[in-house]
Structure formats: structure tokens, C-alpha cells
């Protein structure tokens, strides 16, 4: 049985229940940078033409430089990290036992179960496949750098690691059987663009011996021309990234101060989302929703409430909701 896929978002359902227009709402249910990268103008052929190899190579080169990807690893762009997660269970490893320590982002276990090739095990030491979200969603836990072992696949999902690049495990990406996942949409605030990357050893991602490889599973032209152009531009803009990390760090501390003053306890998180302990997560979500602030709660916890960061114009609305 495939596990349920519970996610943030769902603002339409919140509006249907609590009223208001979409523009009235402050959606803090996701962990997406509320100040997106300024995309600027794009050349007409980015929209009109099928993406060519040069555009793909440009974003790969920019990604290699930005994340300091080792020379022995290859980079495969995809239409979002979720597209890679959905196909990952079909990569060359023959299947077997998979370990996904939770609570964590639920798409990994759901994709493994849906493939029919992997069964879940509670024992990391006997697992043929290990998935770690690093830092973890929703509590921000970091994986142990000694996590790598002799197993068929070790997948490190670094979708939220761009706020803390010093903790990245991408230096291990050239090891056979290791896959590092990167999400573009979260840190750069452009989730609708749909761009992600798989980084790993060529024999793991792109085997040339007739086994399934990720590029074939994704199909031709998997990433749009606009996504390739914007991705390459943004990944080369290291100054914007540094300024953004500083702002996110400041805003995360500001959010913590507001929530603690309102009676919540800090549990964890990253600089893109914060996790709090409250007496009743459902009641807190309802309280915030009455002020048109949408939050994230979890089916496995009655007390965890997760908030993303408000946009610069959203802080007053959150403060009123907490007042």
C-alpha cells in the first residue's frame, strides 16, 4: 500500500473553508523563499524553441560550480526534485530493502512503495537503499557525514541545504551508489519553474550497459527552456545567494521570536521553515486561518506546527494573527 502523500500548500481548500480571496492570504505552509530570484528578461528562443544541448550544458556547468560538484560526478537536470524522486526507485539497483528514517518528506517512501521494487525496513544496517533528507523536513536534523556505507544506493536529499552549504555532503557524489538531490525552487523562490538536479557517479545515474538510466526515464527535453535559462543565470549569481542566506537567517530568527512570544516552543527547522511545538497544532492552525494565515500541520503529530517565512509585506499580518 502506498503511504499517503501529505504536503503543504492546499490554499484553495483553506479559502473554501475560511473565506477571503487568494490575495488576502499569507501562505506559510511551504518552505519556499518568499523573495524570489529576479528572473528578468529571457531570450525569445528560450520560450519558442526546444531546449538544445548548449542550454542544458550551461545549467549543468553553473550547477557544478555553485555546488562544488566533484569532477567524477555527473549532473542530471530534471523538472523538479520530485520528478527525480518518482523515478529513483527504477534506477539500476535491483531493488530490495529500503530505509527512510522518519518523520520526513513523505514522497520518498511513497515513491519507493509505488514502484513495487522496494520493501521498507526499520533497520538501516540491513537496508539496500538509504534515503536521508538533509537537512530534514520538518525538523531540520542533519545527516551524519559518516552515513555512507557499502549498499546499493544512498540518496541524500539536499533540497533545503542551500541555506547551510557548509553542511552539504556533495563531496561524496562521485562515490558509486551515492545520489545527491538538489532543488532549485526552494532557495531561489521559484518553485513553479520546476527545476531540480541529481548528482552522482556515472554508473549510478547514467549507466552505459543497457540498464535503466535517469536521463532515459526523464525522457527528451525534460526541463523547459525558461527553466534552463533562469537556472543557469541564478546559479552563477553567487552574490545574490550570499545576501539571501543572510536575510533568511535574520528572518528565521525574527519568526522564532514572534512564535516564542506567542507561546510556542522551538523544535527545529531550517532558515526556510521553522518547526514549533504547541499544545494543539489543529487549534493553532485554525486560529491563524481565521486571520488568513495558512500553516502546516502533520498527521503524525498533534503538537507540531510548521511555518515558512513571511514575505516583507506579510509580517504585519502574521503579527496581527498572533496578537
Where do the protein language model's features map onto the residues?
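N-terminal "arm"/small-domain region of PLP-dependent enzymes with the aminotransferase-like
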Residues: 1-55, 62
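PLP-dependent enzyme catalytic core of the Aspartate aminotransferase-like
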Residues: 290, 300-323
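Short, conserved charged micro-motifs
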Residues: 39, 126, 280-287, 313-318
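PLP-dependent aminotransferase class I/II
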Residues: 179-260, 264-266
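Short beta-strand
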Residues: 27, 181, 265-269, 296-299
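Active-site phosphate-binding strand-loop segment of PLP-dependent enzymes
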Residues: 113, 120-166
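Conserved PLP-binding catalytic core of the aspartate aminotransferase-like
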Residues: 249, 259-291, 309
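Conserved beta-loop-alpha segment that forms the PLP phosphate-binding cup at the N-terminus of a helix
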Residues: 57, 72-96, 106-108, 196
Amino acid at each position: 500500500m502506498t503511504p499517503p502523500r501529505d504536503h503543504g500548500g492546499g490554499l484553495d481548500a483553506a479559502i473554501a473553508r475560511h473565506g477571503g480571496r487568494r490575495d488576502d492570504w499569507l501562505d506559510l505552509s511551504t518552505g519556499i523563499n518568499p523573495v524570489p530570484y529576479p528572473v528578468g528578461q529571457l531570450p525569445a528562443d528560450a520560450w519558442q524553441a526546444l531546449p538544445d544541448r548548449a542550454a542544458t550544458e550551461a545549467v549543468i556547468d553553473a550547477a557544478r560550480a555553485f555546488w562544488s560538484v566533484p569532477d567524477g560526478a555527473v549532473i542530471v537536470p530534471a523538472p523538479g526534485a520530485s520528478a527525480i524522486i518518482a523515478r529513483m526507485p527504477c534506477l539500476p539497483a535491483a531493488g530490495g530493502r529500503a530505509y527512510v528514517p522518519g518523520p520526513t518528506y513523505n514522497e520518498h517512501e511513497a515513491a519507493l512503495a509505488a514502484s513495487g521494487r522496494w520493501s521498507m525496513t526499520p533497520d538501516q544496517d540491513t537496508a539496500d537503499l538509504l534515503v536521508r533528507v538533509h537537512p530534514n523536513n520538518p525538523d531540520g536534523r542533519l545527516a551524519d557525514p559518516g552515513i555512507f556505507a557499502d549498499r546499493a544506493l544512498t540518496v541524500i536529499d539536499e533540497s533545503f541545504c542551500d541555506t547551510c552549504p557548509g553542511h552539504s555532503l556533495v563531496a561524496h557524489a562521485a562515490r558509486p551508489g551515492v545520489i545527491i538531490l538538489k532543488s532549485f525552487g526552494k532557495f531561489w523562490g521559484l518553485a513553479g519553474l520546476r527545476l531540480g538536479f541529481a548528482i552522482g557517479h556515472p554508473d549510478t545515474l547514467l549507466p552505459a550497459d543497457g540498464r535503466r538510466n535517469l536521463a532515459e526515464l526523464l525522457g527528451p527535453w525534460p526541463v523547459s527552456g525558461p527553466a534552463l535559462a533562469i537556472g543557469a543565470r541564478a546559479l552563477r549569481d553567487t552574490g545574490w545567494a550570499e545576501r539571501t542566506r543572510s536575510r533568511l537567517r535574520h528572518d528565521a530568527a525574527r519568526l522564532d521570536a514572534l512564535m516564542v512570544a506567542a507561546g510556542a516552543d522551538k523544535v527545529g527547522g531550517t532558515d526556510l521553515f521553522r518547526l514549533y511545538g504547541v499544545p494543539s497544532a489543529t487549534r493553532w492552525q485554525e486560529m491563524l486561518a481565521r486571520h488568513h494565515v495558512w500553516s502546516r500541520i502533520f498527521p503524525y503529530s498533534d503538537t507540531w506546527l510548521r511555518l515558512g517565512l513571511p514575505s516583507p509585506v506579510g509580517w504585519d499580518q502574521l503579527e496581527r494573527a498572533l496578537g
